[in-house]
Amino acid sequence: MKRISIVIPCYNSEATIRKVVEMVMEEFKKMDGYDCEFVLVNDGSPKDDTYGEIKKLGEQYKNVKGINLLRNFGQHNALMAALHYTEGDFILGMDDDMQTHPSQISKLIHKMEEGYDLSLIHI
């Protein structure tokens, strides 16, 4: 079974991140031969308890890891921090607000399996 590491920078995402994670998990249930892990990075969210929600997800699901950056370093730095904790065969970056809908994941993985180093979906 191949493992896909889903890395998601999170900023003021307390109200949205659970839905994103659980929708992605539902998509993986439809795909044979794959499982996933999540590396969620709170990028210093000042307005809500994003990291608290990430910790709850980590307690509920064994495939969820959380990182807490003490201040906002920006999306790219949050992604780089996440990469140090991935263990998957492939890495898939997503946004915390579903700019790439979880239903598109199978298309991205298919392209990665074809050998592409970078896969993008234009919606």
Ranges and model annotations:
Residues 52, 69-86, 106-107:
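Glycine-rich, basic loop-to-helix element that forms the pyrophosphate-binding segment
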